[in-house]
Amino acid sequence: MKEMVGGCCVCSDERGWAENPLVYCDGHACSVAVHQACYGIVQVPTGPWFCRKCESQERAARVRCELCPHKDGALKRTDNGGWAHVVCALYIPEVQFANVLTMEPIVLQYVPHDRFNKTCYICEEQGRESKAASGACMTCNRHGCRQAFHVTCAQMAGLLCEEEVLEVDNVKYCGYCKYHFSKMKTSRHSSGGGGGGAGGGGGSMGGGGSGFISGRRSRSASPSTQQEKHPTHHERGQKKSRKDKERLKQKHKKRPESPPSILTPPVVPTADKVSSSASSSSHHEASTQETSESSRESKGKKSSSHSLSHKGKKLSSGKGVSSFTSASSSSSSSSSSSGGPFQPAVSSLQSSPDFSAFPKLEQPEEDKYSKPTAPAPSAPPSPSAPEPPKADLFEQKVVFSGFGPIMRFSTTTSSSGRARAPSPGDYKSPHVTGSGASAGTHKRMPALSATPVPADETPETGLKEKKHKASKRSRHGPGRPKGSRNKEGTGGPAAPSLPSAQLAGFTATAASPFSGGSLVSSGLGGLSSRTFGPSGSLPSLSLESPLLGAGIYTSNKDPISHSGGMLRAVCSTPLSSSLLGPPGTSALPRLSRSPFTSTLPSSSASISTTQVFSLAGSTFSLPSTHIFGTPMGAVNPLLSQAESSHTEPDLEDCSFRCRGTSPQESLSSMSPISSLPALFDQTASAPCGGGQLDPAAPGTTNMEQLLEKQGDGEAGVNIVEMLKALHALQKENQRLQEQILSLTAKKERLQILNVQLSVPFPALPAALPAANGPVPGPYGLPPQAGSSDSLSTSKSPPGKSSLGLDNSLSTSSEDPHSGCPSRSSSSLSFHSTPPPLPLLQQSPATLPLALPGAPAPLPPQPQNGLGRAPGAAGLGAMPMAEGLLGGLAGSGGLPLNGLLGGLNGAAAPNPASLSQAGGAPTLQLPGCLNSLTEQQRHLLQQQEQQLQQLQQLLASPQLTPEHQTVVYQMIQQIQQKRELQRLQMAGGSQLPMASLLAGSSTPLLSAGTPGLLPTASAPPLLPAGALVAPSLGNNTSLMAAAAAAAAVAAAGGPPVLTAQTNPFLSLSGAEGSGGGPKGGTADKGASANQEKG
């Protein structure tokens, strides 16, 4: 190793630690010195070590940073094959590390083009105008300042800093223009004691509990307080990759969410980057935590201090980051005490998004995962208990809100204690629930104390990561694993080892779902804070912190944020639509469920939800907290409200229905987990689609009202309302389930009936007599039973079954009754079968129809025995009618027979054929006939039989002159149809077959009705049937049957279905209803869709 000359090229810290040594490149004429964590060195070699530039052996002239004009320094490969400084990647928010652990390659694809268009004012001041426009510039982290400069230029000018947002976990990588940097220095000096103390405390806490990162630990061990920034730098090296990513992501989010963006962006980017190296989360977490710390220091200053300064100044602390942190702390604590932490915590708010993010992660790490698991459950049972912890959490949060460097430690320890006292009142609700346990909060704090730096830093990093990642994920896709980001956010499994693991596991789960999940939650927090402005941001971030701290990990928070977000149009919508909607939606629901499951048990849903909603500004955090804590129940109701509004629309959404239904069922049980899934489902649904969100609008409105009420301290009422909404949602779910069951049962019954009806009935020889009288029929059903009744019954089912019944009744592909062209053979056949019985029962008029329709011999019989059975049964009284019906059924296909038979009472046997034809009439006809040619053959045979039967009828003395006329016309029509059928048969297609069948049946029908009405038009036929029935009396039944047959033929595209459908109409018409034209054959298909009359 070379002798140590100068500091780290990344963090500028000259110190090295055993856990995070300063490594020097052994390349020729290379002066690169970096901390292991700052450069992403997984393992420092015992022999010579070479930086990536020297390792690549590329000519120095070809190695230049794509983000700045400088060629020297610690460079790494970029995703596009170029090179970039690690420090440039850390300080430019949109730059990410594909692998946070190794901090390479550097991902530049998300850097907006306008960054490359900015010019460096430092280069211009120093006379390097030619280089001023090269690379990508960062902007002064001071809110409102538009000065742009290269990262390396600012580094050389000493304008970069790492602001520790949450003492331990995260570091904000901040850079300021000279003017604002000097102001930041003065403000830091003024609040330096508090900030430094807090930072130092945080550092030592991080060191103690920070098995996380040697750098961190050593930093905390080493004069982290006195040299917070240096250890920060050192850790920043490690955390930087993470922080860098977090910062980038945070900045990325920063843009969307402006208030938290300032604070959160650094954190998120860091977390993002940490997340990027999720795989090496542990090491990176160590390094990231250090980096986080330093990054937080620097970025916190940059983002936190900058944004906080901006906001903090706006709020109350215009001082430097330190003072800001202090101000934030005091503001938070005072806010907490005052009960307006959200509003008074504007300054804390600014830091809050950042810090909030920290607490968020930190809490989940230390408290939430260690404690919330246990405390959370207790929290759910006792909302008030969780509330005090919430206050603590919030205090933490507030403290976290305060700048990490200043407030970080104090926040965790003294600040949190101080803020806690006031916090409980103000944030109590949100935080307690969020924490899910006062112990959790406190413990978290202590845990932070023990390993606060890692935990706090980690949470912040995680949060930043989350926020940035969420935004990035939502924008760019799933991105890095949430879990790793969370882990890293956790600051590595080291400090919050257990919490970290839990958080990692939990958060991993949550994170994954978060795809914007944790990000979303943090992002939401950020968004909400930005959206809501200083007061909004603070609460939002605070809530965020509590969310994580609340033992709700991001995942929960995210869903809630969704819910809440939906409620909160700005916060939730942006997040849910951009983050959750795209990548996180599905993941969120899925993972969220598991998180919910695990979180719900630990915490009560009601409080969480309530608190979530209570905090209008902090919808996200609170929801998360609540969700994880007791509030789950409350959230559920809230969600259920949203869900109930969504329920019907959402049910249409498969994913929602599947998720929502079972979760809703669970909700029925009122299990917190169930509630959570429901909440998640709704949340997911809402983010997923605008439609879902719209459905949730009513719920959202209520939820928003609930949030407002909760914000006003009416959490209890909100809980009740949410529970009511949940209850209503559960009831709706039960009702729908019952409906499904009933429909299923009906379907089964119809199927059974169909099978029964498929069995051919004995043919009734006395067709005419039967026609004259009610059809004692094969079914022996009373003629009074109306086919319309059967239709209505089949139609009565609201579900598709009813449709199927209608279809089956109408046998034709287009259900005359339903007017629906649905063609479900099984459904049709089933349903058609039951209707036929009622039809048979319907009346003698029906029989007459059947009789005229059944004149065809039993050609249908060959077709499943339905044709002949329908002929015999349907025509029961009238063999000729049977033949006709059989002919129709045969020609139309079994469906016709079945329907006609069923309708006429002669169709008793037909149902079987119907069922066969029931499917798509087209398919079924072939099924019944076994082939188009076979069907055609049957049609021809049936037509011949029908002609014979009609001739017999004409010869029969029973026929009156009117009947004879009708029969004669029918014979003519049958002959005409034969020609049409032959032509159609030539087509050989099933549909043509159906139309042929329809055609064949039509001639019969038209033959029956021609005397009264033109056979050509189905409507005339039906009216004719009606007229015929009255005029013929008993004979009318024959005429009616003929008319019905004609109507049927006219009605259905596939004759079989058509015939069946029409028979109902015809039957009613014969009885005097004058079914009106149902439709025509396939040829007369238009009429099929006409009114039933």
Curated annotation (Swiss-Prot):
Residues with the Phosphothreonine modification: T451
Biased composition (Low complexity): 317-340, 410-425, 787-796, 818-832, 839-853
Keyword Metal-binding among UniProt keywords: yes
Entry superkingdom: Eukaryota
Zn-finger segments (PHD-type): 5-57, 118-181
Subunit structure and binding partners: Interacts with histone H3; interaction is necessary for MLLT6 binding to nucleosomes; interaction is inhibited by histone H3 'Lys-27' methylations (H3K27me1, H3K27me2 and H3K27me3).
Subcellular location: Nucleus
Region of interest: Disordered: 185-500, 775-871, 1060-1093
UniProt-recorded name of the protein: Protein AF-17
Disease (UniProt): A chromosomal aberration involving MLLT6 is associated with acute leukemias. Translocation t(11;17)(q23;q21) with KMT2A/MLL1. The result is a rogue activator protein.
Biased composition (Gly residues): 191-212
Pfam families in the record: PHD_2, zf-HC5HC2H_2
Keywords for this protein: Chromosomal rearrangement, Metal-binding, Nucleus, Phosphoprotein, Proto-oncogene, Repeat, Zinc, Zinc-finger
Chain intervals annotated as zinc finger (C2HC pre-PHD-type): 62-95
Biased composition (Pro residues): 258-268, 374-388
Bias (Basic and acidic residues) ranges: 282-300
Amino acid composition bias (Basic residues), ranges on this chain: 231-255, 301-316, 465-484
Organism: Homo sapiens (Human)
